[in-house]
Amino acid sequence: MARARLAGVRDWAASAKLASAGKPGQRVIDAEWVQLNLARVHAKAEFLKLLNWRVAAGGSVGPADASVTKVFGTEFAVEAYRLLMEVLGAGAVVRSGSAGEVLAGRIERAHRAALILTFGGGTNEVQRDIIAAAALGLSIRRR
């Protein structure tokens, strides 16, 4: 996940004010749920970075580790962009260049692109079968 996108949402939330929900005039970033969404995205992004470094470094990596990284990473990307879009509100889905758009629609475009990652490079269902067989010693389901 691009750190710039998380930083962009954080910066937007630090400068944007709530209009009606919560406390009108309060900065968006001061809402507890916004802080939780941003913290979740940051923490999982850091975990994914460590997971990728572990797989890239080799060493004691098992045969299912690349599959684990792929499944976690792609599903996290979808979740992360959904959480960031919640922070941005309705403006997150407004077309770039239109009145009311937020951050030029980049987060919504990234969310749509992240959905493709769940089947590009091997569907997550197939990756789970690899994890089941290689990491857990389970039999692979016939499809």
What is the predicted function of each stretch?
Residues 1-143:
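Alpha-helical interface subdomain recognition
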